[in-house]
Amino acid sequence: MLKKLVAGTLVAGFALTVGLGVASAEEKSNTIKSFDYLKVDEQNVNSLTKVSDQDKKDIQITMVLPEQNENGDWLAYGFTSRETLDAYIEKDKKALKNKINPLGSGAGSTDFYEHKDKGGQYIYWSSGFKNLPSSWNDRISSVSTASPSASYSTTLWEHTSTQGYGKGVVFKHADWYGKTANLAADWNDITSAIDVKK
């Protein structure tokens, strides 16, 4: 589906810019393809009771950790609802309150790119929920998170809020700052809403 880009339009804090960065070899290996769930709704999943295909269908939101298992699956926490994710985030923010060490005064915004490895045009968002404008709907292919001193996490939503959000994938800034997450087929070019939590 052909998307029209309206040049020069700023939408609620979005800035449309051309990204010219070159990605390192480490960033190129951060393609998010599949998950190995360690916890679902804060309940541990052990090696004997791996998450079944049916249980995976119940997982609505995945928090991706910056580590992979021996098969290349990304370690992750699963959540069956926005409420269980929000409860986890509130607990985790309290635990991290005095443990976040900023990497500098820099990036207070998460950058969303149209191509992998921070390629092509990008938009940035600093705080709060945003349904993407039509020019950016189903267009995001890679993410570079804000500093953990600026905000807690970035969530990509499959649908807009008026469409019920759909599935979500979360990147905690303390884990992902300084790295680029490339979105594989399951998430590439399907994001319709974003949320950067303080």
Residue ranges of predicted features:
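Sec-dependent N-terminal signal peptides of Gram-positive bacterial secreted proteins and lipoproteins
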Residues: 1-25
